[in-house]
Swiss-Prot record:
Protein name: Major outer membrane protein P.IA
CDD domains in alphabetical order: gram_neg_porins
Residues spanning the signal sequence: 1-19
Subunit structure of this chain's protein: Homotrimer.
Organism expressing this protein natively: Neisseria meningitidis serogroup A / serotype 4A (strain DSM 15465 / Z2491)
Membrane topology listed for this record: Multi-pass membrane protein
InterPro entries named in the record: Gram-neg_bact_OMP, Gram_neg_porin_domain, Porin_dom_sf, Porin_Gram-ve, Porin_Gram-ve_CS, Porin_Neis
Family membership: Belongs to the Gram-negative porin family.
The organism's place on the tree of life at top rank: Bacteria
Location in or out of the cell: Cell outer membrane
Biological process according to GO: monoatomic ion transmembrane transport
Pfam families: Porin_1
Length: 395
């Protein structure tokens, strides 16, 4: 009996040593379908006989078939813990990893938010792959789960969300206010960017058009983030800011806003400069009601001193009825300004509607439908329709 008791105590010692380590994550997957529709309007010259050339308009419409597949909706696993160092100081750490129940996915550990740091009365200081302030604010405005982050999530609006390799400081809360600053060294920032483009080759017997993907090069520049938060009862507010002097990373974000419209084809676009982003988010929670509103301004400068800017708004509302939580989101991007000129009919509109049904505190069914229309000029647009149904389990 004594031997059994001794063995039991010894086996419990390793568990006690790691008692401050938490295992957590989400497994979520389902079936999703999507299709694309587009319209291209071209002005052409036609022979008008005695009257000479007559301009006519050619309208081309196309629609893809509905593509349906089983997808992972962003599953991940994480470990986090802390150690009391005495005198109110403690070490904190976290390691998160993307996983996929649909196979494939990331192969490197720590590809989500992963860091080590110190926390105390002074606040929290972390280094590693740390979420930026835009990612923090998006938790309220975009709670959707999907494999299609452009249409079935507010992917265009959230294009500045990131988890860069950086150092971040978060202050303690003072009368509901708290702040944060974050620094990304140039060697850890995203690489310089040469825009993707289409090239046409004539071999004599045939003409082929090939898509050349974006090319990365040397590191860009230091990137700075800052955030200010306020919370009072059911109300919460957040301001997020980003600045990069040599904004090579900005071109990626601007092209995402354009949804790959090819606007930079043959223009020799330089990497962007003085790239700054401002986002203001406000939310209210009362009982089963959740409301969130956000506005975002994206500013940048080209090598020839001309300016680019985009302005967007987004809103999300949900209400709990027993186990069901119906939800709707809307986002709108106004006509952008590129190289100092307003792009006519270059706005976008997006609607996502769905419902979560909780079988328990940890397991839910998730259903959503999405519609995104991106105007790419007068008479031109790209439209994405998507729907998904799946299951999510939190642990």
């Amino acid at each position: 009996m004594r031997k059994k008791l001794t063995a039991l105590v010894l086996s419990a010692l390793p568990l006690a040593a790691v008692a401050d380590v938490s295992l957590y994550g989400e497994i979520k997957a389902g079936v999703e379908g999507r299709n694309y529709q587009l319209q291209l309007t071209e002005a052409q010259a036609a022979n008008g006989g005695a009257s000479g050339q007559v301009k006519v308009t050619k309208v081309t419409k196309a629609k893809s078939r509905i593509r349906t597949k089983i997808s992972d909706f962003g599953s991940f696993i994480g470990f986090k813990g802390s150690e009391d160092l005495g005198e109110g100081l403690k070490a904190v750490w976290q390691l998160e990893q993307d996983v996929s129940v649909a196979g494939g996915g990331a192969t490197q550990w720590g590809n989500r938010e992963s860091f080590i740091g110190l926390a105390g009365e002074f606040g929290t200081l972390r280094a590693g792959r740390v979420a930026n302030q835009f990612d923090d604010a998006s938790q309220a405005i975009d709670p959707w789960d999907s494999n299609n982050d452009v249409a079935s999530q507010l992917g265009i609006f959230k294009r500045h969300d990131d988890m860069p390799v950086s150092v971040r400081y978060d202050s303690p809360e003072f009368s509901g206010f708290s702040g944060s600053v974050q620094f990304v060294p140039a060697q850890n920032s995203k690489s310089a960017y040469k825009p993707a483009y289409w090239t046409t080759v004539n071999t004599g017997s045939a003409t082929t058009t090939t898509f050349v993907p974006a090319v990365v090069g040397k590191p860009g520049s230091d990137v700075y983030y800052a955030g200010l938060n306020y919370k009072n009862g059911g109300f919460a507010g957040n301001y997020a800011f980003k600045y990069a002097r040599h904004a090579n990373v900005g071109r990626d974000a601007f092209e995402l806003f354009l949804l790959g419209s090819g606007s930079d084809q043959a223009k020799g676009t330089d990497p962007l400069k003085n790239h700054q982003v401002h986002r203001l988010t406000g939310g209210y929670e009362e009982g089963g009601l959740n409301l969130a509103l956000a506005a975002q301004l994206d500013l940048s400068e080209n090598g020839d001193k001309t300016k680019n800017s985009t302005t967007e708004i987004a809103a999300t509302a949900s209400y709990r009825f027993g186990n069901a939580v119906p939800r709707i989101s809307y986002a709108h991007g106004f006509d952008f300004i590129e190289r100092g000129k307003k792009g006519e009919n270059t706005s976008y509109d997006q609607i996502i509607a769905g419902v979560d049904y909780d079988f328990s505190k940890r397991t839910s069914a998730i259903v959503s439908g999405a519609w995104l229309k991106r105007n790419t000029g007068i008479g031109n647009y790209t439209q994405i329709n998507a729907a998904s149904v799946g299951l999510r389990h939190k642990f």
